[in-house]
Amino acid sequence: MNGYVDFSPSPTSPTKEPGAPQPTQAVLQEDVDMSSGSSGNENCSTGRDSQGSDCDDNGKELRMLVESSNTHPSPDDAFRLMMTEAEHNPSTSGCSSEQSAKADAHKELIRTLKELKVHLPADKKAKGKASTLATLKYALRSVKQVKANEEYYQLLMSSESQPCSVDVPSYSMEQVEGITSEYIVKNADMFAVAVSLVSGKILYISNQVASIFHCKKDAFSDAKFVEFLAPHDVSVFHSYTTPYKLPPWSVCSGLDSFTQECMEEKSFFCRVSVGKHHENEIRYQPFRMTPYLVKVQEQQGAESQLCCLLLAERVHSGYEAPRIPPEKRIFTTTHTPNCLFQAVDERAVPLLGYLPQDLIETPVLVQLHPSDRPLMLAIHKKILQAGGQPFDYSPIRFRTRNGEYITLDTSWSSFINPWSRKISFIIGRHKVRVGPLNEDVFAAPPCPEEKTPHPSVQELTEQIHRLLMQPVPHSGSSGYGSLGSNGSHEHLMSQTSSSDSNGQEESHRRRSGIFKTSGKIQTKSHVSHESGGQKEASVAEMQSSPPAQVKAVTTIERDSSGASLPKASFPEELAYKNQPPCSYQQISCLDSVIRYLESCSEAATLKRKCEFPANIPSRKATVSPGLHSGEAARPSKVTSHTEVSAHLSSLTLPGKAESVVSLTSQCSYSSTIVHVGDKKPQPELETVEDMASGPESLDGAAGGLSQEKGPLQKLGLTKEVLAAHTQKEEQGFLQRFREVSRLSALQAHCQNYLQERSRAQASDRGLRNTSGLESSWKKTGKNRKLKSKRVKTRDSSESTGSGGPVSHRPPLMGLNATAWSPSDTSQSSCPSAPFPTAVPAYPLPVFQAPGIVSTPGTVVAPPAATHTGFTMPVVPMGTQPEFAVQPLPFAAPLAPVMAFMLPSYPFPPATPNLPQAFLPSQPHFPAHPTLASEITPASQAEFPSRTSTLRQPCACPVTPPAGTVALGRASPPLFQSRGSSPLQLNLLQLEEAPEGSTGAAGTLGTTGTAASGLDCTSGTSRDRQPKAPPTCNEPSDTQNSDAISTSSDLLNLLLGEDLCSATGSALSRSGASATSDSLGSSSLGFGTSQSGAGSSDTSHTSKYFGSIDSSENNHKAKMIPDTEESEQFIKYVLQDPIWLLMANTDDSIMMTYQLPSRDLQAVLKEDQEKLKLLQRSQPRFTEGQRRELREVHPWVHTGGLPTAIDVTGCVYCESEEKGNICLPYEEDSPSPGLCDTSEAKEEEGEQLTGPRIEAQT
């Protein structure tokens, strides 16, 4: 609006109006020029063409205005005006032509004032009538605004001309005409214009304007382009032609069609007019303008100016030729809860006749048919109930620009603010069902539009606003991108219901359908809405993949532990949560975003690495607080973020699927929302419980569970009950979040120390994380192939019955990581097909509770600390229905067994030297009834029973998955194995030391079996069994086992010197080979037991665990016949530097049971330095605080430790003899009072096997 169109008085028949003031033409014409710039809308003849007294009134107002004008402040202004009138208009009766000119000028003045009054906003009118004074003030203010805009442009150009002009090409006038002609010559309704960004003047305009506007091209010469725009479109023009927003022409020219379509997103709409088409009206025509940035050289040798090159195309009605096909007459609008348009799709322009800026911030109800306005209240009630989900409703009639009504079929949805749970805006996707009678929607309305809303409209708007101010119930939308918040197909159906055949318009709309308004947030929401269907499809496809399923199920399993979260968690997680607690909605929303981003970045990798989403047994009881500390003792950095997201959304879920959580929560939405009667067929919780039934996929399980949704609707859950339940869950979630955050301070300080302690095993950390899912792709190289199946099966064996922190399982040699999943159980536990020979089922050494001395034939009760709901199969020693095995002198509450079939090697049918109490009771195997006749005890060394101090067991067995041919619900049998050959058992008997017991204790505590001291004394040694490679996959622990897990063939080299490690494979002849200080297999670099069963987490690794997992080699029952092949496998799979070194080491050196010695003083010095670092994080109390602490805690006054943690030895220690060293296991929970025993503790039989190994830190 830099200037205005000058209107010369048109000759009309003279009309005398006596008594009317007759100001001079010069003075009045100047006033008209100053105030008539905002000349009219489509038709500006809507004012009264008054005569007589009306003219007198207008003349009086004008005279009063001139007299009081600030530009003529002197008191004799009126006199001066009258004198001027007298000089230029002498009163002569013969000058009729002069009188006629005066009359024409006065009439033109009055008409111009009326045109200005039409543009006066309604809020500036007094009692609905526009006064001349208010109109002229409004015009003057508009002129000042335009001048301010010009000054702004000049300042902008002076500051930005240098950076903007660097890459902007410069063209002459002829070149501009040449580069634009190829675009506009093909379209008669398009023209090109170059507008200076400095002065706003038109430097170039194409010849097509003459035919489009029916005027001469000279009308645009030396004029400002905004003079030809409709007044309310000037601001839109300025906002879209800001220099830094404009793409340079050189970038846009010569590009492919897709890029050009993308650049069309910069286009906007304006109305342009040139002069009058009729006597009393100015007709504007709508144009779509696409701006570009160029430099134009106006004259030869002159300096180039930054210009905006506009390609303007006239917009025709969508109902006139060329018509828009009926199936593509679709557009989208959004409006606020107070029923004001927030954004309008550009596709609405040819269908409604309105430009986007015409509707934005105007009432929606005003544009509707009066009979349809009450429907909007019902529609908004349903919008509130739908909670963001789209739905169709009754058609509504919408008024177009020409005053006609069109009928629209609309799909309504909403966006819910995740923080406030209130509706932010409503989205309407409209499809024109019936077009207008007058197809020219851009025609002027026959009557002026109502300026003030009808009272009923205002009342209805208030009702809708009050309605939408209520929080949306948690019925199905997480409020974050809630157009597809639940990933349900219902949204896709409802979207296509109103636009089934949108065709290519959809793709174009996604590129160029961004609203040309200042509301950027609405634009983003619109884009999200348009692509919602495709996003949901991709999300659904992602969910169908095994990785997504595993991740979702794992999340639920971790979260089902409930109270375990505050006790222990990841160091990274706690550090992440070291923030002020936010609201539930904020945490849930951030959780959704994190998991969505992780799913996008990890989906491809996880899909390639995970193969068994349904092989995760469920927990059927509340897990003890120590669960996560054991699981997450050594998290990898990659895993930590996943774990944070998992725990952020942790809500205690019921045992049944009364509250259904959508699987989509793991990628884009919160998993804490409770859905009742939801149509999504992915109830996670029941899916988790049913996963144990077999190797069927998660989708299959979820599909079966979807049929159980019917009864859910009959449970009597009302909105009130659901809201109360949801609020309770949210409060519990926030409470646990705060409790976990309290541990962040201590955990953050310990993290550096823990990382330093485990530097040497950084390469193995990915194998000991919690989920096992991430560990499968943590490693690279050849190990990646081996890790593909090493996903941790999350059975309840990770929980402890005593409630203490859980220790890590030592690595299992020759076992398959997936053996305990339902899909592989048939291979791991008992083979489905018989083999030539059955090796006896060696038991796991089970330990009884402290103070109980086992004797042969004695039945020891299982530990009482097991969790409720876990099945504890205890077979009495005297009753063995299926297996002809003999009871073990130790307590066998779980009594697992593993039969290992050898294809060719004949084993002795019986073992006369085997003690009566060697083998434990074996549980019943219903799936393999014939196995009892096949399995016979192998020759083993005698194990004279001896009394020993036993420890408190830690048992957490779980109920077996249906269809799993595994040991009742005992934990994997090989987790408790102490040896697999007579020689190994001999060594076990000879060299069983406190560390062996503690290692086994930690192991068994981790795996969920009873942990107790192993009673072993000296016995006669026997020769090794001949080599016979295993053919059956055996269970393994992915958390602890990796490519360096021992191979059964490798251990043939080591049986002569091998100790009885707690990680031995029961029947693979691999046993557990480790040095006397590694008996928790920390030598393997795995997580050791809670009792510290392992050497230091630095570099003291065993020289005997250097082979591949037999489950990887023998997954398809492959056999390795001899030691030479074993050695080849050693060299093939050993990838970590230590194992590569050991693989190339001579066998004689490998069998020396020697470990690199460390200087005791150096170790102590390092420890002292680390303690000094940790000392800084010790709390410092003021004197007042210390006084309060002494009053409450007496031990603070004495300077000692609390009784609960002031222990002289570890609870797992078998003996408290001199020299025992109890060290806390750093990687576990930092809870006080939990300590480990070093693996370096030796016992009586130590002198029989070799020198004592010092404990390493």
From Swiss-Prot:
A motif (LXXLL) lies at residues 306-310, 1051-1055. GO terms for molecular function: DNA-binding transcription factor binding; histone deacetylase binding; histone methyltransferase binding; identical protein binding; kinase binding; nuclear receptor binding; pre-mRNA binding; RNA polymerase binding. GO terms for biological process: chromatin remodeling; circadian regulation of gene expression; circadian rhythm; fatty acid metabolic process; gluconeogenesis; glycogen biosynthetic process; lactate biosynthetic process; negative regulation of circadian rhythm. Residues 821-832, 996-1014, 1070-1092 have a biased composition (Low complexity). Residues 510-709 are annotated as: CSNK1E binding domain. The modification Phosphoserine is found at S525, S528, S531, S538, S544, S659, S693, S697, S706, S758, S763, S939, S971, S1126. The gene is Per2. Residues 179-246, 319-385 form the PAS domain. This is Period circadian protein homolog 2. The keyword Ligase does not apply. Keywords: Acetylation, Biological rhythms, Cytoplasm, Nucleus, Phosphoprotein, Repeat, Transcription, Transcription regulation, Ubl conjugation. A motif (Nuclear export signal 2) lies at residues 460-469. A motif (Nuclear export signal 1) lies at residues 109-118. It comes from Mus musculus. Residues 35-53, 493-504, 1033-1044, 1093-1111 have a biased composition (Polar residues). Residues 478-482 are annotated as: Important for protein stability. Residues 1157-1257 are annotated as: CRY binding domain. Residues 882-1067 are annotated as: Interaction with PPARG. Disruption phenotype: Animals show severely disrupted circadian behavior. During myocardial ischemia, they have larger infarct sizes with deficient lactate production. Mice show reduced muscle strength under stress conditions, show endothelial dysfunctions and have a mean arterial pressure significantly lower compared to wild types. They have elevated circulatory insulin levels associated with enhanced glucose-stimulated insulin secretion and impaired insulin clearance. Animals also have increased levels of liver glycogen and impaired hepatic gluconeogenesis. Residues 393-436 form the PAC domain. Homodimer. Component of the circadian core oscillator, which includes the CRY proteins, CLOCK or NPAS2, BMAL1 or BMAL2, CSNK1D and/or CSNK1E, TIMELESS, and the PER proteins. Interacts with CLOCK-BMAL1 (off DNA). Interacts with BMAL2. Interacts directly with PER1 and PER3, and through a C-terminal domain, with CRY1 and CRY2. Interacts (via PAS 2 domain) with TIMELESS. Interacts with NFIL3. Different large complexes have been identified with different repressive functions. The core of PER complexes is composed of at least PER1, PER2, PER3, CRY1, CRY2, CSNK1D and/or CSNK1E. A motif (Nuclear export signal 3) lies at residues 983-990. Gene3D superfamilies: PAS domain. Signal peptide: none annotated. Transcriptional repressor which forms a core component of the circadian clock. The circadian clock, an internal time-keeping system, regulates various physiological processes through the generation of approximately 24 hour circadian rhythms in gene expression, which are translated into rhythms in metabolism and behavior. It is derived from the Latin roots 'circa' (about) and 'diem' (day) and acts as an important regulator of a wide array of physiological functions including metabolism, sleep, body temperature, blood pressure, endocrine, immune, cardiovascular, and renal function. PANTHER family: PERIOD CIRCADIAN PROTEIN, PERIOD CIRCADIAN PROTEIN HOMOLOG 2. Residues 1-60, 471-565, 617-638, 757-832, 994-1044, 1070-1115, 1224-1257 are annotated as: Disordered.
